[in-house]
């Protein structure tokens, strides 16, 4: 049976590998954040934070990774984002791929689809409205079948395909709802998609030229997906595989083994697994990663209320504490720092939560989080 490695041992293994920091002594600089628990913080940059003022504030707090989300960044803007970050900070940059996911295109502001209405689904970019929307990648239309269902975003409209026409499809709105631009679309049955988009490949090539040392594979589904990305990134780069689909859960062990770290995206995972079971699978994946001695990050909704408010809820603070008690080694701020009202305040709150965890946890559990064998998977995944 695999041994559960102490948190410090796992962190040491991770940090010994080279990364793209411009300062090789970054971890030992005066004023650098030092965490007894080895908890890493990854911050997503976006409209609220991709500017010199905020990047410098994040650097001052010694966050561990700055994430560029390719799902919300145009390929022509990636170079400028990297240059801006490097001009203000030596924090390593992570390029987070689009991966094997479906998204809708641009739509008119305030679009609401009414239950019972008909809509055309198109493979070519259009300004979406109540009569038509575009989906990408266009390859999904090659295997799309009648009666396939589509859910747009978490609380958006649900569509059912009633027929194919030309290169696109026709659908009926079974549950009305709001549709916003560039939102994830969940299709059942799930289409077969390559692990990387053309945009991902172009971004990775740019990252290689610029010395980017961290890459995240979205929607990792198998060891083959991981291996295919390994072939493209630099040999000394970190590969973080994101477990955020049913296939990723079923193949978690082979994905973990082939990666330098894994990231649990609870939001996307909840599209394919019942919401009430996501906390259970978080614990399973964290324990498996610990047993394979690989760092594991947890993302989505850690401080969701701070996207629009100055303070989190007690439930969110409790979630962070329990995530760390589970054995997670990294916390990911996404919307909180990308589009939130106070990106720096969100990081400060995470730092406070980590500090409280260290003050209390190491007194209560001096040997680390209680290790327990992961329970079996439920029928909803298998």
Where does each model-flagged region fall?
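Alpha-helix boundary/capping motif
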Residues: 10, 15-16
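Non-catalytic helical/linker scaffolds that mediate oligomerization, partner binding
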Residues: 16, 21-382
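Extreme N-terminal basic, low-complexity initiation segments
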Residues: 1-10
């Amino acid at each position: 049976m695999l041994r559960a490695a102490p948190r410090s041992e796992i962190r040491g293994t991770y940090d010994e590998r080279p990364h793209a920091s411009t300062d090789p002594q970054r971890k030992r600089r005066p004023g650098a954040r030092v965490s007894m628990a080895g908890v890493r913080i990854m911050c997503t940059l976006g409209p609220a934070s991709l500017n010199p003022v905020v990047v410098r504030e994040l650097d001052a707090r010694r966050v561990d990774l700055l994430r560029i989300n390719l799902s919300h960044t145009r390929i022509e803007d990636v170079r400028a984002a990297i240059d801006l970050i490097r001009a203000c900070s030596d924090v390593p940059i992570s390029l987070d791929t689009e991966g094997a996911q479906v998204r809708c295109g641009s739509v008119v502001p305030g679009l609401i689809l009414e239950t019972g209405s008909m809509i055309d689904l198109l493979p070519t970019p259009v300004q979406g409205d109540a009569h038509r929307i575009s989906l990408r990648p266009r390859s999904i239309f090659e295997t799309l079948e009648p009666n396939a269902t589509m859910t747009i975003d978490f609380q958006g409209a649900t569509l059912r395909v009633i027929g194919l026409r030309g290169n696109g499809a026709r659908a009926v709105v079974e549950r009305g709802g709001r549709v916003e631009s560039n939102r994830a679309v969940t299709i059942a049955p799930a289409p077969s998609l390559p692990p990387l988009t053309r945009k991902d490949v172009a971004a990775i090539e740019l990252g290689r030229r610029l010395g980017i040392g961290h890459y995240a594979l979205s929607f990792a589904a198998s060891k083959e997906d991981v291996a295919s990305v390994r072939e493209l990134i630099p040999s000394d780069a970190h590969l973080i595989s994101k477990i955020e689909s049913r296939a990723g859960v079923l193949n978690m062990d082979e994905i973990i083994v082939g990666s330098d770290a894994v990231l649990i995206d609870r939001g996307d995972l909840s599209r394919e697994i019942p919401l009430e079971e996501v906390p259970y699978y978080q614990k399973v994946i964290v324990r498996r990663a610990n047993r394979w001695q690989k760092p594991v990050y947890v993302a989505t909704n850690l401080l969701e209320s701070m996207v629009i408010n100055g303070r989190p809820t007690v439930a969110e603070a409790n979630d962070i504490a329990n995530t760390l008690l589970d054995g997670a080694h990294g916390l990911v701020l996404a919307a909180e720092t990308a589009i939130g009202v106070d990106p720096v305040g969100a990081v400060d709150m995470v730092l406070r939560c980590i500090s409280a965890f260290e003050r209390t946890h190491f007194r209560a559990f001096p040997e680390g989080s209680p290790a327990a064998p992961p329970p079996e998977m439920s029928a909803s995944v298998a």
